[in-house]
Amino acid sequence: MATSAGKLRTLYSAHSSLSSLPPSARPTLQLATLRSYATTTPHDSPIGNTSNTPPTVKRPATAFKDKLNAGPAFSDFVSGKKDEPLDPAEAYALKTALVGPPGRKKEITRLPPWLKTPIPDSSNYKRIKNDLRGLNLHTVCEEARCPNIADCWGGSSKSAATATIMLMGDTCTRGCRFCSVKTSNKPPPLDPHEPDNTAEALSRWGLGYVVLTTVDRDDLADGGARHCAETVMKIKQKAPNILVECLTGDYAGDLDMVALVANSGLDVFAHNVETVEALTPFVRDRRASFQQSLRVLKAAKAAKPELITKTSLMLGLGETEAQLWDALRALRAINVDVVTFGQYMRPTKRHMAVHEYVRPDVFDLWKERALEMGFLYCASGPLVRSSYKAGEAFIENVLKKRKGGNAGSVNEKVTTSENVKKLVAGEAMR
């Protein structure tokens, strides 16, 4: 120990430059001197000559701070100076991004600002989600990754909370190129308790409007029509004041099953044509067709003329203006009451790509055109979905006005225990 101390004193006295420094600086320089003598490269100064040494690699945190310091200052963002407009190439660059691993990066188009929504966070949202898990129920809101889940489940001052329950499981027998719902030729069997569980959940939530949607079940003889109708009846028994909309499949073209669901006590019968006729073979499953969807909507109206019928079209798939006009004329010809327009948004990279992001003013234009053609109601906007804001005050008022004082008797007629038993036994109601 004494020998080491003596060596340090000798080393210190050998450099007169160190003795002239203030005491506080000496330990640092002394340590630097020791490090320089520990290397194999000779140095001409106590601190060492760095001309022959490799550059020092900065720690990630230090490099990040240096990058921030070299970036724009706060004044660059609050300056009152008006910037020059971007040229088309620069504007496009702001809407694209490179994603993927090094060497395999792909350029993708970023979402425009009008398609961005807040993160869901409300007591009503959390309560509905917990009940769904407890009763083993599914919603198309979650399965289809709907961007409006916070708005619909949370409700607002202008409309009641709306939930879309997905019946008959979470697996569809069809594989449409726009849809993110799971697909299989042999999905799990139906849950016999689902109608009761759905009615129980809805009676707890106190919703003003509920949408029941179904996966396609081509593996079932009736396509699941009786299961759907039984669920509607059970809901009306437990919560007679709730308004029920059914967003159904085409039941493989079986119009008797369409009539069965239409007469089950629901308030709105919805079936989506999804896109214009020319694009249907490229967008929907091969077992679906535009003309078959028209027949389904027409049969529902024929089975119950006072029933509101509804359909939806996605924009941004490559449709033309003339094709949209033709689709609307075909829908009005069969007395469809409500139509909605929404932007197609690609769920995953495995699904068909977006052809274009349609501007909000174009959606407003198609809403005006639809209303001028005689549709009872039209919801149109980038974030509108077939069941989005289905419980809007306008539709609720129309339904209540149509029912008037006979609402109770109509519901009682189709929701008696006797009719439920007949339905389960396979007897269609007439």
Swiss-Prot record:
Its main location: mitochondrion. It is found in: Mitochondrion. Its EC number is 2.8.1.8. One of its GO terms (cellular component) is mitochondrion. Binds 2 [4Fe-4S] clusters per subunit. One cluster is coordinated with 3 cysteines and an exchangeable S-adenosyl-L-methionine. GO terms for molecular function: 4 iron, 4 sulfur cluster binding; lipoate synthase activity; metal ion binding. PANTHER family: LIPOYL SYNTHASE, LIPOYL SYNTHASE, MITOCHONDRIAL. This is Lipoyl synthase, mitochondrial.
